Amino acid sequence: MKKTQRYEKRLEAARENCREVMQTYKKEIELERKRMNASHNGFVRQCCQQNIDQLKAEKEAIEMEVVG
């Protein structure tokens, strides 16, 4: 029974950590969007979009790792 309780505690800690990581990615993506929308420079907008795409890809990879 103790092993199950330890497992449940570790699982909950991992879930909480994952939620925090996902929130961080969400905030970073939102900041890049704001930066992109505020800029009238095409190069800066393109860089922001690349950053957003990369952050989304990393976030999705983490989600797939956690689910799979």
PLM feature spans:
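Short, charge/polar-rich alpha-helical segments
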Residues: 2-26
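Short, charge-rich amphipathic interface segments used for partner binding and complex assembly
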Residues: 24-68
